[in-house]
Amino acid sequence: MQRQEIEETSGKYLEFMVHGFMNGLITLQELEGISDEEMETVYALGYNFFTYGKYEAAKDIFTGLTAYAPYTSHYWRALGAVNQQLKDYTEAIAAYDMAVANDENDVVSYVYRGESQILSGNVDPGLNDLKKVLELAPAHPEAGQWVQRAELLLKLQESKKPA
């Protein structure tokens, strides 16, 4: 009798978990029981590939991470950075969109999305992202280098305008 109860309880738990996943209530990471620490270890591997110019390998890792933890902003930012390095600006922008959707104060993603927008010919949306960085700056003093980068890019774009 006890074995049957265990099987019924396990079945109900599995059904609950799958239902939660299918309805977006839990992530694949949670469904699989992968810890945040394990995810960050995989992220570090992807980051190392990225640092050494192994962009396709890094892209595979970051794509997997975003599938397993779609609400983790820095995984999306990393995927955006890889796509930006590969000059796939459409995919980079989409990944940065997800990063910003998950963290509306992600100054770094705004800078990189702005760059990608400008590089893909969407200058006005790119400038808007860079201006957003300046709006967020007072609340994020730790983002000084990104604010400086946004200011520099805005000045460069301003200097390209006809007089």
PLM feature spans:
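Long, contiguous interaction/recruitment modules in multidomain scaffold/adaptor proteins
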Residues: 1-37
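Alpha-solenoid helical repeat scaffolds
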Residues: 11, 31, 37-47, 138, ...
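Alpha-helical adaptor scaffolds
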Residues: 36-103
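Register position in tetratricopeptide repeats
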Residues: 51, 85, 119, 153-156, ...
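TPR/TPR-like (Sel1-like) alpha-helical repeat modules
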Residues: 118-141, 148-155
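Canonical tetratricopeptide repeat
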Residues: 78, 112, 146-149, 153
